[in-house]
């Protein structure tokens, strides 16, 4: 155990749905903080005013709650370092930027975005790296320009002075990473509208919120050089960094829509279980010491360490996730599955809410019957439909006729109709007895008989347990469908 002061954070931008990569980042931060008896902080990085929305933030929060990744500090619940939305922390960034100016680590620049672009293009035309320096930028800080800005109420941008030296990162997943001297030049930390750049806001927040470990996707690795320079300017020890490799599709290419569902919200809509999604996401890069795959969150927490996180890209396979979800689903009590399935069954109009509740025992029996073939909740209505839809099998179908014409099949079907019609009892035991009696008396070939019977009752040669199917169809329906063919 590292220490009980571990503080991790998940800091998403509320600009859309929470994708698989972001969800895994949140999960790894949550797991690491819980394993080390620390704190998991949620911070909303909403300084991109044009793209950030309250709706996206609400959706993000609901998704994290659904995943059971409950934060110790953050929006809604607050904490010692609030506010936890960057849009509410602008004064903090502005104050901290002025601190760096006073220390000589940063400088104001009375320069427009167009002029910054001109400086860049000029450097490129001269065959030089497009790196800004104080000498190049400060020449715009003329007395006339400063007076003009003051008169118009405009604010300067603030640049950080980038030290020209090597930076070394000891990444807990990637290992040693060297950022060579001269990789970048000076860079903006505060825009003229008072809004910080991403790297500056992140560092200020991580300092203020006492973040000890930054666990994030390796697409952020290039940002680390700028962030290390900002930490150095503040004379603050950087947190421990751990950059998790990207997630690829089964074809080895970057995960995208063409690989199927990529956002947690899509999994929610399709009827995945949060515990299955957590389990699967944890295995995208991390592995259990004993190679176990089906793991409750508590066991993942107990065994989670960064040294078991692979530095190679993880492969996202939705088929594997579906399989895992099926394992979790089949381990649940039928009463709980009944509750979980309700919005999917009633939402499909297969049954009304009232029908679902009034016929609870029947629904639970139907769920029990189809469960072995169900992996996600949204598959349930289609699987359950066999017990509810009316069917008129084509008795001229060549495959059906081949089965139906085999020895003893017609006679056995006639006998079943007779026994079911004469016996008022309707339960699986009675159905089994009557089937056995018909089989013993007519002695049909087994496979043709069962294939014919299933086709007559469900218009399919394959399906769930036949005895349960007959019971769930109901006595009247079974008699009606048998009657259609007993004269053939």
From Swiss-Prot:
GO terms under biological process: glutamyl-tRNA aminoacylation
Record key words, sorted: Aminoacyl-tRNA synthetase, ATP-binding, Cytoplasm, Ligase, Nucleotide-binding, Protein biosynthesis
Chief location category: cytoplasm
Subcellular compartments: Cytoplasm
Reactions listed under catalytic activity: tRNA(Glu) + L-glutamate + ATP = L-glutamyl-tRNA(Glu) + AMP + diphosphate
Family under the similarity heading: Belongs to the class-I aminoacyl-tRNA synthetase family. Glutamate--tRNA ligase type 1 subfamily.
Protein name, UniProt field: Glutamate--tRNA ligase 2
Organism: Petrotoga mobilis (strain DSM 10674 / SJ95)
């Amino acid at each position: 155990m590292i220490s009980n002061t571990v503080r991790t954070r998940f800091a998403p931008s509320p600009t859309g749905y929470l994708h698989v990569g972001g969800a895994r980042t949140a999960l790894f931060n949550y797991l690491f903080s819980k394993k080390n008896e620390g704190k998991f902080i949620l911070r909303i990085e909403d300084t991109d005013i044009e793209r950030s929305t309250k709706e996206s933030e609400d959706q993000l929060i609901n998704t994290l709650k659904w995943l059971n990744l409950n934060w110790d500090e953050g929006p809604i619940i607050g904490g010692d370092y609030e506010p936890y939305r960057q849009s509410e922390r602008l004064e903090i960034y502005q104050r901290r930027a002025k601190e760096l100016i006073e220390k000589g680590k940063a400088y104001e620049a009375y320069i427009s975005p167009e002029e910054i672009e001109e400086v860049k293009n000029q450097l490129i035309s001269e065959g030089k790296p497009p790196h800004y320096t104080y000498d190049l930028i400060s020449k715009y800080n003329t007395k006339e320009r400063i007076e003009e800005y003051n008169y118009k109420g405009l604010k300067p941008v603030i640049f950080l002075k980038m030290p020209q030296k090597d930076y070394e990162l000891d990444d807990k997943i990637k290992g040693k990473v060297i950022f060579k001297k001269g990789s970048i030049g000076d860079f903006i930390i505060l825009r003229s509208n008072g809004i910080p750049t991403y790297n500056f806001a992140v560092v200020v927040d991580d300092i203020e919120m006492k973040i000890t470990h930054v666990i994030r996707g390796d697409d952020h690795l290039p940002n680390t050089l700028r962030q290390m320079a900002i930490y150095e300017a503040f004379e603050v020890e950087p947190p421990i960094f751990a950059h998790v490799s990207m997630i690829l599709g089964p074809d080895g290419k970057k995960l995208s829509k063409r690989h199927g569902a990529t956002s947690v919200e899509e999994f929610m809509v399709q009827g995945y279980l949060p515990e299955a999604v957590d389990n699967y996401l944890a295995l995208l890069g991390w592995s259990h010491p004993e190679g176990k795959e089906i793991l409750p969150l508590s066991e993942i927490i107990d065994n989670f360490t960064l040294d078991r996180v692979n530095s190679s890209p993880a492969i996202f396979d939705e088929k594997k996730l579906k399989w895992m979800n099926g394992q979790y689903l089949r381990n649940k009590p039928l009463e709980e599955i009944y509750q979980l399935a309700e919005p999917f069954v009633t939402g499909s109009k297969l049954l009304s809410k009232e029908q679902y509740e009034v016929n609870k025992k029947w629904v639970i029996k139907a769920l029990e019957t189809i469960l072995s073939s169900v992996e996600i909740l949204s598959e349930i209505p289609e699987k359950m439909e066999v017990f509810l839809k009316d069917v008129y099998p084509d008795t001229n179908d060549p495959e059906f006729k081949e089965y139906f014409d085999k020895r003893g099949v017609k006679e056995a079907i006639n006998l079943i109709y007779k026994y079911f019609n004469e016996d008022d009892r309707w339960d699986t035991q009675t159905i089994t007895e009557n089937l056995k009696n018909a089989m013993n008396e007519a002695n049909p070939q087994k496979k043709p008989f069962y294939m014919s019977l299933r086709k007559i009752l469900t218009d399919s040669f394959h399906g769930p347990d036949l005895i349960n199917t007959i019971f769930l169809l109901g006595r009247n329906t079974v008699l009606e469908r048998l009657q259609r063919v007993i004269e053939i």
